Amino acid sequence: MADEQNLDAQAQDQAAEAGAGDELTTRVQVLEEQLAAAQDQSLRVAADLQNVRRRAEQDVEKAHKFALEKFAGDLLPIIDSLERGLDLSNPDDESIRPMREGIELTLKMFQDTLKRYQLEAIDPHGQPFSADQHQAMAMQESADVEPNTVLKVFQKGYQLNGRLLRPAMVVVSKAPSPATPSINEQA
């Protein structure tokens, strides 16, 4: 009987060890899953942090690049006025020649300064119309050029660092309409 009790005790011990082994295996699996989830979350947080840093750097870069946008926009009417003044003055009139030369020099210095800050004029005369950079003020029939070609520029457009600041206001060509026959030709 003592042997049976020893066998029962050994069986119980083995069963307890097997149960404890199953518990340990289950516990190890749970801990491994938690570890994997924590590592995954850590990677996601690191990736999010890197994305936030990259976006912040891009925002700062854009802020530096386009900080002059409002100021440059306020300068455009001044450039327009100087150009209009030159266009309206007679280059052959000796009485205004010194003033005209002064305006020309001022305008050139102004344009050179703006170019240094990547503010560039859009003067599309003779180019195909582009809705991205031009604003059509009128359409005019023309057999001399292809349809949708800029015939006249009312006001130059400007770009700052490649971004449109003001579209060019233009007259765009269209194909001539077919001549309508007169009443005599129809008969």
Curated annotation (Swiss-Prot):
**What residue stretch is flagged as signal peptide?**
none
Which InterPro entries does this UniProt record tie to the protein? Answer: GrpE, GrpE_coiled_coil, GrpE_head
Q: Write down any Gene Ontology CC term.
A: cytosol
Task: Name a biological process GO annotation.
Answer: protein folding
Q: Where is this region: Disordered?
A: 1-22
- Superkingdom: Bacteria
Low complexity composition-biased segments: 7-22
Q: Which UniProt keywords apply?
A: Chaperone, Cytoplasm, Stress response
List the PROSITE patterns hit by this protein, alphabetically.
GRPE
The family assignment reads: Belongs to the GrpE family.
| Function per UniProt | Participates actively in the response to hyperosmotic and heat shock by preventing the aggregation of stress-denatured proteins, in association with DnaK and GrpE. It is the nucleotide exchange factor for DnaK and may function as a thermosensor. Unfolded proteins bind initially to DnaJ; upon interaction with the DnaJ-bound protein, DnaK hydrolyzes its bound ATP, resulting in the formation of a stable complex. GrpE releases ADP from DnaK; ATP binding to DnaK triggers the release of the substrate protein, thus completing the reaction cycle.
The molecule here is called Protein GrpE
- According to its UniProt entry, this protein's organism is Pseudomonas syringae pv. tomato (strain ATCC BAA-871 / DC3000)
Output the lineage of the source organism.
Bacteria, Pseudomonadati, Pseudomonadota, Gammaproteobacteria, Pseudomonadales
